[in-house]
Curated annotation (Swiss-Prot):
Residues of the signal peptide: none
Protein family: Belongs to the eukaryotic ribosomal protein eS28 family.
PANTHER family, per database record: 40S RIBOSOMAL PROTEIN S28, SMALL RIBOSOMAL SUBUNIT PROTEIN ES28
GO molecular function (one): structural constituent of ribosome
Keywords recorded for this protein, A-Z: Ribonucleoprotein, Ribosomal protein
HAMAP family per the UniProt record, alphabetical: Ribosomal_eS28 (MF_00292)
A Pfam family it matches: Ribosomal_S28e
PROSITE patterns per the UniProt record, alphabetical: RIBOSOMAL_S28E
Protein name: Small ribosomal subunit protein eS28
InterPro entries: NA-bd_OB-fold, Ribosomal_eS28, Ribosomal_eS28_CS
Keyword Protein biosynthesis recorded: no
Gene3D superfamilies: Nucleic acid-binding proteins
Length: 76
């Protein structure tokens, strides 16, 4: 049943830069992506993405309003 779920409002975005990793075990990538469709076409956002990602990948965003906070400096 979950495989049949389709997001009508999803917008494609292309990964143009990988800023780093976050999360307790580094499983989340922070990326900059360029919106390819919808009302925000051409806008560049910073988003957190779970799972493997590389430059040029297309990701589907349910909404394009939110941006991720910048990664902070790591304490030693």
């Amino acid at each position: 049943m979950a495989d049949d779920m389709v997001y009508q409002e999803a917008v494609a975005a292309e990964v143009i830069q990988i800023n780093g990793r976050t999360g307790v075990t580094g499983e989340i990538f922070q990326v900059r992506c360029k919106i390819l469709g919808g009302k925000d076409t051409g806008r560049i956002l910073t988003r957190n993405v779970k799972g493997p990602v590389k430059l040029g990948d297309l990701i589907m965003l349910r909404e394009t309003e939110r941006e991720a906070k910048q990664l902070g400096k790591r304490r030693k």
